[in-house]
């Protein structure tokens, strides 16, 4: 594939992702908090700091991996970096493979660090990247963490995608040993299982981003790029973000769990945190805001989002994320069926 074709693919991904909408029914709607009528705290007492093993985030919300690798996506990353800088959000760039192959593409990613020199930024590579290239991806952004995206369904639907996965786990283990920043194993919209969490812990991984189905759908994106569009039957593949968080319940003492995938509202963020996430990523909402409304509008959107999150935590009598995890909630029958069939031990406040 030529550099031009790779740039074109990056742009196609963004265009199709922006045109997608969230699933009409979300598993977030299957989780309900138990309301407490008289809170004992005030909104200004709520502390949204997210504390992980290696770094603290001012807010438990981050701009998740999206793009880079073309002139247009360079402009998007620059805008998002301004938003991150002005609001204090952490930010992840998309896969840096384009820059690792072609140094001319490096600035479409490094612009994020140039624009936001003091912020928390995650770099991003695939699970098959050579170890030395993973180190290079961290250096490219002076990144605080490295996301390794695992995207087998996307690759298999992608016409020119990878068909070899047998070395992925061993390669992840080698990267974890080599890089000097935390490694976040990140799904891309298909969710994670308790079996995967155990496998990752066994090779030294301490961070995951569960990225469940319900948001950007890469099966749909890649199927649109197929000449006969014949793999749309896989559009519902995988676990939702809520199911993936439930699957992580037994491993949350060993893993820093981040949540993403179909997160629509501050209430979805608060539910994710209550279910064990330390931070919550969003992609398409930020992308649409910054491209359709501009930087100032996106900053206002983030500020409003943060205030709404604090309001919900006040209703739940939670001064911080640790107290939020003690909130009481109930699941509907479909989630209860998942919990029972999967043998999950879930704390519900």
UniProtKB/Swiss-Prot annotation:
Stored Pfam families: FMN_dh
Family, as annotated: Belongs to the IPP isomerase type 2 family.
SUPFAM superfamilies: FMN-linked oxidoreductases
Superkingdom of source: Bacteria
Cofactor(s), by name: FMN; NADPH; Mg(2+)
NCBIfam families tied to this protein: IPP_isom_2
UniProt binding sites for Mg(2+): 155
Keywords annotated in UniProt: Cytoplasm, Flavoprotein, FMN, Isomerase, Isoprene biosynthesis, Magnesium, Metal-binding, NADP
Species assigned in the record: Staphylococcus haemolyticus (strain JCSC1435)
Entry annotated with the keyword Protease: no
Matching InterPro entries: Aldolase_TIM, FMN-dep_DH, IPdP_isomerase
Subunit structure: Homooctamer. Dimer of tetramers.
Function: Involved in the biosynthesis of isoprenoids. Catalyzes the 1,3-allylic rearrangement of the homoallylic substrate isopentenyl (IPP) to its allylic isomer, dimethylallyl diphosphate (DMAPP).
Protein residues bound to substrate: 9-10, 95-97, 154
Positions bound to FMN: 65-67, 95, 124, 186, 211, 216, 262-264, 283-284
EC number, UniProt record: 5.3.3.2
GO molecular function, one term: FMN binding
Name of this protein: Isopentenyl-diphosphate delta-isomerase
Cellular component terms (Gene Ontology): cytoplasm
Root EC class: isomerase
Record's catalysed reaction(s): isopentenyl diphosphate = dimethylallyl diphosphate
HAMAP family found in the cross-reference section: Idi_2 (MF_00354)
Example GO biological process: isoprenoid biosynthetic process
Subcellular location: Cytoplasm
């Amino acid at each position: 594939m030529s550099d031009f074709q790779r740039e074109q693919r990056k742009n196609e991904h963004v265009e199709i992702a922006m045109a997608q909408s969230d699933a009409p029914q979300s598993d977030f709607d299957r989780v309900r908090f138990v309301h407490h009528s008289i809170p004992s705290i005030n909104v200004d007492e709520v502390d949204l700091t997210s504390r992980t093993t290696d770094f603290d985030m001012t807010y438990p919300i981050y701009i998740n991996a999206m793009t880079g690798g073309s002139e247009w996506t360079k402009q998007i990353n620059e805008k998002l970096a301004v938003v991150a800088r002005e609001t204090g959000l952490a930010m992840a760039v998309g896969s840096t493979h384009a820059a690792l192959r072609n140094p001319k593409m490096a600035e479409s990613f490094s612009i994020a660090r140039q624009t936001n020199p003091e912020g928390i930024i995650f770099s991003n590579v695939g699970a098959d990247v050579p170890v030395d290239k993973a180190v290079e991806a961290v250096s490219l952004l002076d990144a605080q963490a490295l996301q390794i995206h695992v995207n087998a369904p996307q690759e298999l639907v992608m016409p020119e995608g990878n068909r070899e996965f047998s070395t992925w786990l061993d390669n992840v283990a080698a990267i974890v040993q080599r890089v000097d920043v935390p490694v976040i194993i990140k799904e891309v919209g298909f969710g994670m299982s308790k079996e995967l969490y155990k496998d990752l812990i066994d090779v030294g991984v301490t961070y995951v981003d569960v990225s469940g189905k319900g948001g950007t759908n890469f099966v749909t994106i890649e199927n649109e790029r197929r000449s006969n569009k014949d793999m749309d039957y896989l559009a519902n593949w995988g676990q939702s973000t809520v199911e993936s968080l439930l699957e992580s319940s037994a491993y949350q003492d060993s893993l820093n769990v981040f949540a993403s995938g179909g997160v629509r509202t501050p209430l979805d963020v608060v539910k994710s945190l209550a279910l064990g996430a330390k931070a919550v990523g969003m992609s398409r909402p930020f992308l649409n805001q910054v491209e359709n409304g501009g930087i100032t509008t996106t900053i206002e959107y983030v500020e409003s989002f943060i205030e709404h999150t604090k309001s919900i935590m006040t209703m739940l009598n939670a001064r911080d994320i640790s107290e939020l995890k003690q909130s009481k909630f109930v699941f509907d029958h479909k989630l209860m069926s998942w919990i029972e069939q999967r043998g999950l031990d879930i704390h519900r406040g």
